[in-house]
Curated annotation (Swiss-Prot):
One GO cellular component term noted in the UniProt record for this chain: cytoplasm
Species classification: Eukaryota, Metazoa, Chordata, Craniata, Vertebrata
Identification of the protein by name: FGFR1 oncogene partner 2 homolog
Polar residues bias: start-end ranges: 199-217
GO aspect biological process, one term: response to wounding
Key words of the record: Coiled coil, Cytoplasm
Coiled coil: 6-106, 163-188
Main location (coarse class): cytoplasm
Chain positions covered by the region annotation Disordered: 194-217
Length: 217
């Protein structure tokens, strides 16, 4: 009777661990969905990188405010991606730690079950081992796949973020050069206006002098 109670308790504990694994699997699926969304955003950023080349071509024809706004928006998008990347990395580490803890407790429960059932029907033990081993293997495979996807997304995001930062620096330098050219153009225009005004004043003086001479004659 005591042996039967021990087995039932061990089975109940094993079932509870399986339920926790299922809950953990749901959380892992949610994390995979977040990773997929992040990959889509990375693809969108790649497309933006292609579009920014077109922006460089027409930058000279756009107002300064438009260029500054584009740079600010790009910085904000990169910061958001980096923050989301950090949160996903933290979630991945937490899920891996939780999986290791659950696996450890599961092995402990299975060991107790085996020790308590040495004199019982070995077919029960084999059936339990096969059932729970299959379920655990499915969860482990899913977590492993999710971790691989996450690492790839993180590598792509980090690499893309560096390239985008270089693009921003290049755009800022081009913007600075455009402003310098604009300033030089304005100064040249003002100098031309001053010279025109000076020439007009001189011409007006000559006309006035000639007119006075004619009147005296």
């Amino acid at each position: 009777m005591k042996m039967s109670c021990t087995i039932e308790k061990a089975l109940a504990d094993a079932k509870a661990l399986v339920e926790r694994l299922r809950e953990h699997d749901n959380a892992a699926e949610a994390l995979i969905e977040q990773t997929t969304a992040l990959n889509k955003r990375v693809e969108a950023m790649k497309q933006y990188q292609e579009e920014i080349q077109e922006l460089n071509e027409v930058a000279r024809h756009r107002p300064r405010s438009t260029l500054v706004m584009g740079i600010q928006q790009e910085n904000r998008q990169i910061r958001e991606l980096q923050q989301e990347n950090k949160e996903l990395r933290t979630s991945l580490e937490e899920h891996q730690s939780a999986l290791e803890l659950i696996m450890s407790k599961y092995r402990e429960q299975m060991f107790r079950l085996l020790m308590a059932s040495k004199k019982d029907d070995p077919s029960i033990i084999m059936k339990l081992k096969e059932q729970h081993s299959k379920e655990l293997q499915v969860h482990v495979d899913q977590i492993t796949e999710m971790a691989a996807v996450m690492r790839k997304a993180i590598e792509i995001d980090d690499k893309h973020g560096c390239k985008e930062q270089e693009r921003i620096i290049q755009l800022e330098q081009e913007n600075k050069g455009l402003r310098e050219i604009l300033q030089i153009t304005r100064e040249s225009f003002l100098n031309l206006k001053k010279e025109d005004a000076s020439e007009s004043t001189s011409l007006s003086g000559l006309v006035t002098s000639s007119d006075l001479s004619l009147r005296k004659s």
